[in-house]
Amino acid sequence: MNPGIILNNRVLDVVFIAWFIAQFYKVLTSIFKKGKLDITRMWDTGGMPSSHSSTVSCLVTSIAIRYGISSDLFAITIIFAGIVMYDAAGIRRAAGKQAGVINSLIEKIPLFIGKAQYNKHFSKEKEAKLKELLGHTPFEVLVGCILGIIIGLLFRKYLQG
């Protein structure tokens, strides 16, 4: 059997492809949404599809193909995937919403204390906006999950080889 490319591990190869496709899709959609190429989306979190979900669901699928669904590795990866996807759609999404509220409040401070006072005391904080696009909607997680499963199945022969 030929080893994989990444650390001689075929599962890592396929999981990387699932992550890459999910992230590259975000770059492509930025062209249509913004009318320009935004390569930073390749390393950014949040948005459609969830690369976290595509990565862990591809991992689960790859392990199922390579070692079977009765293996300990499958049990570990499916629990891990559930935690990651729950976190992506729940906790990280909530943190992103909270960041949006905080950013909005910070923008309104000058209305209450005056612009001169704000610039005097808060100029550094003004520059450091909190990142709002952290998590995913349940639909983005679902699409990422489906993408990961499809990628794993498409590389079935490679994983078995």
Segments predicted by a language model, with ranges:
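Helix-loop-helix hairpins and the membrane-proximal interhelical loops
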Residues: 1-24, 32-35
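Membrane-embedded catalytic cores of phosphoryl/pyrophosphoryl-handling enzymes
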Residues: 23-25, 39-161
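Hydrophobic residues in alpha-helical segments
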Residues: 31-32, 64
